[in-house]
Structures are given as C-alpha cells and as structure tokens.
Regions:
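Secretory/endomembrane lumenal or extracellular ectodomains immediately following the signal peptide
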Residues: 1-67, 93, 100-103, 175-254, ...
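Short acidic alpha-helix initiation/capping motifs at coil-to-helix transition points
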Residues: 45-50, 80-84, 129-138, 232-238, ...
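Short, thiol/selenol-centered motifs that function as redox-active sites or metal-ligating centers
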Residues: 71-95, 159-163, 255-282, 289-290, ...
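Alpha-helical scaffold segments that form or flank carboxylate-/histidine-based iron centers
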Residues: 33-39, 66-79, 110, 150-157, ...
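Amphipathic, Lys/Arg-enriched alpha-helical patches that create a basic surface
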Residues: 153-170, 339-356
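Acidic/histidine-rich alpha-helical segments that form the ligand environment
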Residues: 118-157, 302-343
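Acidic/His metal-coordination segments adjacent to aromatic residues that form catalytic metal sites
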Residues: 106-115, 294-301
Length: 362
C-alpha cells in the first residue's frame, strides 16, 4: 500500500476563521489545539459536535486507548483521509509509539502480528467503514469469539463511526494535512513531548456509563441512538441530530434528501424508513421519493435540491481528489454556510446509516 502522504489532495476549499472562545473550549476539553475546526467553524451545531466527538474518541468506557488509536488509523487509511491519519499518527508519536512501529502499521495495518482479539476489532472496523458489503451477524460473532462483550462491540462501532464522520468532513473540505504530517518531527514537539503526552493522556481518562435521560430517548433516528445507550457518545449523537435538524441553514427537506440518498446507497432499511417519513412530512409523495432515490433526479426537485442529491451520493464511497473537486463545484451554487452544513449533514448521514445497518445485524 502506498504511503498516505502520497495520496493526491486538492488545495483547501475553505479559509480559516479564528474563534478564540471555541478554541479555548476545545483545548480545555481535549488537551489539544483546535486543529481543523478553524476552517469550518461558525455553524453552531457542528462546532459543538466536533468538540463532543473528539472527547468521545478520547474517553472510552470499555476499550483501551491503544485500540482506539489503531481503529482511527485503519478507518482513516480505508477512507484515504490524509488529515485524520496524520493527526492520529502524530498523537501516537507524542504518546510514545516508535516511528518504526507506526511506519510498519502505515504500510499494511492488517499484516501486523496482532493477537486474535486486536485483529478481530480492526477487521470489523474496516468493514464497518467500507460498508461494501457492511458487517453482518458473522462479524459480530467473530468479535464475541475473540472475547468482546456487547458494550465493547458497540463502543468499537462507535469509534469507527466517529472516524467515518471526521474522515468525510476533513477530506471533502481538503483540510491541509501537511503541517500535521510534519508535526512529530518539529523540534519543539520533540522537546516538550513528555508534557504534551501528559496533557493528552489526562484528557483521555476513562469515561463512565451514562444512560440517556427520558427526553433524550426521542427525536429523529432515536432507535439508532438508543442502540448506543450507556455510552457518552449516545448523548453526543442525540444532541448532534437535534441540532442538525433544528438548523435553518439548509431546509429540512434538503437535509432529509441527503439522508435518504445515503441510506438508499448503503442499504439501511432502518434509516431509510424514517427518512422516507420525514420526506412525506415535507410534502413529497411516495412515488416521487422513489424516483429521486432511484435516478437521483426528478422534476419535483429544485435546482439546489438536484445539486444536493447528486453531491450526497458521491460521499458514500469516494476518491479524495475527486470528491474535493466535486465539493469545489458544489460551492459555486451555495453560500459558505450552506456548503459547510451540506458536508456536515452528509457526513452524519454516512455515520448514522452505518450504525443503523449494525442495529439490524447485531
């Protein structure tokens, strides 16, 4: 496999926007600089989601940080996400993993001599990310045979789903990976590595089980969220979905179309049924919905909706340079805020539909 830094990557689609308040929140919560958020900050629910999901990746209930790092590497590698891979690589270096070991992992993660338990988790995570075909009962049984309990399996899937989200956000926006790729070799990082490692590890303490409150058990895609109940990620996902749906940057019908296109492409009946009901509530008839999802076009779509539908389909599986070029084209007909929300909604859709498939397979 070629090195991640050799993957073609377009120039960044967005100009950075500094937000000192958000930067302070992020640093306090994660122990790290804000990183990519400065490029797409300004959409309230997405700012919050980025912070919550970063904390959820760092703090696990039942699996250890080393496994989380390996899952992050394999999912980012599977999605050809140079930014997330470089970020994970840098964190592993800061936390003390030797460069030689990381380079071996980068060349071929699954050729490494992992024990049966680690390999089962990584195989599952890669199949979850790729979703072509998605994991099925046999994959769950393989995890159980390897010694994982139900909470650990859900947590492995949750970590992989968060990476699916971040991989798309950072790749589609073409966030520049170059400084992150060089970060571990900077003199000041080498000098202060013990302090940086302490700050990062302190922010990644073990999380506690957090059952959802009664009012968090309702809302769009509640059945999928309830399948994660007990993990702090379930609360983050509930709040994310509520914030996304309440946002007025894109119309609800536009967001529902994105969700519907992704659920059809991935074959997620759970999400597909619910999003079909959302589209009916937004004024589309059943035969119109079927026409849109079958042909990705329809006379009932506005020009903007047509653009959104076509773009959403491309986010399911992609090559980085091509999806970045398509993103640049999509920007021409949308405001910055609309484009940022479109990418965020499509990324959430890819996450939620993969989780929805698991709910049916487990």
């Amino acid at each position: 496999m070629s090195l991640m830094r050799e993957i073609p990557w377009e120039s960044c689609l967005l100009e950075p926007r500094r937000d000192p308040k958000l930067e302070r929140r992020f640093r306090r919560a994660t122990g790290r600089p804000i990183g990519p958020v400065i490029y797409y900050s300004g959409t309230s629910w997405l700012d919050d989601t980025t912070l919550w999901f970063n904390v959820n990746v760092a703090k696990q209930v039942s699996i250890d940080a080393d496994l989380v790092g390996l899952i992050a590497m394999i999912v980012s590698q599977d999605n050809s996400c140079r930014f997330c891979f470089a970020e994970t690589r840098a964190l592993l270096r800061i936390l003390g993993m030797p460069e030689r070991r990381i380079s071996q992992l980068e060349h071929d993660l699954l050729s490494e001599e992992f024990d049966e338990r680690e390999r089962a988790a990584l195989e599952f995570s890669r199949r979850f990310s790729r979703a072509n075909p998605p994991p099925d009962k046999r994959d769950f049984d393989a995890l159980r045979t390897a010694g994982y309990d139900e909470l650990q399996i859900i947590e492995i899937a949750s970590v992989a789903s968060i990476l699916v989200f971040f991989n798309r956000v950072t790749t589609i926006f073409a966030l520049p990976p170059y400084s992150m790729e060089k970060l571990p070799d900077r003199w000041y990082v080498r000098l202060f590595r013990p302090l940086l490692a302490f700050a990062v590890s302190r922010a990644g303490n073990t999380a506690q089980i957090e059952p959802l409150e009664p009012d968090e058990r309702e809302g769009i895609f509640s059945e999928i969220v309830l399948g994660l109940d007990g993990l702090p990620f379930a609360r983050s996902l509930r709040r994310t979905l509520d914030g996304m749906w309440a946002s007025t940057v894109l119309a609800r019908r536009e967001k529902a179309l994105v969700m519907a296109v992704v659920s059809r492409a991935l074959g997620c009946p759970l999400a597909g049924k619910e999003v079909g009901e959302l589209l009916l509530a937004e004024g589309l008839r059943g035969e119109q919905i079927d026409e849109i999802l079958t042909h990705l076009t329809s006379p009932v779509l506005t020009a903007k909706e047509q653009q959104i539908v076509a773009f959403a389909r491309e986010t399911v599986w992609y090559e980085p340079a091509r999806i970045q070029q398509l993103g640049r084209n999509a920007m021409q007909g949308l405001s910055r805020e609309e484009f940022v929300e479109l990418v965020a909604v499509a990324s959430i859709a890819n996450m939620i539909c993969r989780l929805g498939i698991l709910a049916g397979a487990a």
